[in-house]
């Protein structure tokens, strides 16, 4: 599937080079994640993709839906994943990942859902209230709020012109960060708003009249996965519970002139009995 779209300048596929690069990273002890683009082709093969990654011992994955517009027509390209297809893909991928509550692979989206279910903030930017997780810095020093918005409209400045902290505090940067904070339209009453938080701005307004291109896919997936996410979260919460404190027991009673039960060899009235008789402040 990789070589269908990722072709080198000489017309050859790049899959062999990518796998060679991964082996070099492994040989050097460098940790890495795999970014997987879900397009019209790969969207039909979640099982084959999962099996390949598991067999290849690639355990840290991130799946990103391909949604591209044709610049000439404004319509969604033929190679983009379709909403229904993406929903099917996520549901089946989750079924494989779940593994009876003991996942063998880290998939970023699923891991974030578990984190949120145990009360931790999401790490994925699309699942956060504001789009301010990072800034993109290009080779020439140009800065942008997101790698999906590297364009003239959202150029925030250049590191050769002003320091990074000034760019991060710029009103334009803050505007982008806050654009998704207030629920709009049907999102206001959506049962999944607390998880989705209106999703990624990249997929908004791709099709006239539809706020988020992959909204229907996410709704279907959340409904499919929610019970098992809750099961994993409950197990993690149980593991985090501290061991109960041992029950408090009172010292055995003894007569005043008997040997003290603590084993000191002294009479009770001159040892623990005296302490017990002392008034407390």
What is each residue range found by the language model?
Residues 150-256, 270-281:
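Flexible mid-to-C-terminal extensions adjoining Fe-S/redox cofactors in radical SAM and related proteins
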Residues 132-135, 252-254:
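Secondary-structure capping and boundary motifs in well-ordered enzyme cores
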């Amino acid at each position: 599937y990789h070589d269908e779209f990722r072709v080198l300048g000489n017309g050859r596929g790049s899959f062999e080079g990518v796998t060679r690069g991964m082996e070099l990273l492994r040989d050097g002890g460098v940790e890495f994640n795999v970014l997987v683009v879900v397009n019209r082709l790969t969207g039909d093969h979640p099982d084959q993709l999962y099996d390949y990654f598991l067999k290849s011992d690639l355990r840290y994955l991130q799946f990103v839906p391909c949604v591209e517009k044709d610049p000439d027509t404004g319509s969604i390209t033929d190679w983009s994943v379709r909403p229904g297809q993406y929903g099917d893909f996520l549901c089946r991928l989750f079924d494989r990942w779940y593994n009876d509550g003991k996942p063998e692979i880290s998939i970023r989206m699923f891991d974030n859902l578990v984190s949120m279910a145990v009360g931790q903030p999401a790490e994925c930017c699309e699942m956060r209230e504001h789009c301010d997780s990072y800034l993109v810095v290009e080779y020439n020093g140009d800065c942008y709020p997101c790698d999906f918005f590297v364009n003239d409209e959202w150029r925030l400045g250049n590191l050769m012109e002003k320091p990074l902290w000034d760019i991060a505090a710029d009103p334009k940067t803050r505007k982008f960060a806050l654009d998704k904070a207030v629920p709009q339209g049907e999102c206001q009453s959506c049962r999944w708003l607390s998880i989705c938080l209106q999703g990624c701005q990249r997929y908004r307004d791709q099709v006239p009249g539809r706020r988020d291109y992959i909204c229907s896919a996410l709704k279907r997936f959340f409904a499919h996965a929610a019970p098992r996410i809750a099961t994993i979260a409950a197990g993690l919460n149980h593991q985090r519970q501290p061991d109960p404190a041992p029950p408090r027991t009172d010292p055995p009673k003894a007569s005043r002139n008997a040997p003290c039960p603590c084993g000191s060899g002294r009479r009770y009235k001159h040892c623990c009995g005296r302490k017990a008789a002392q008034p407390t402040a």
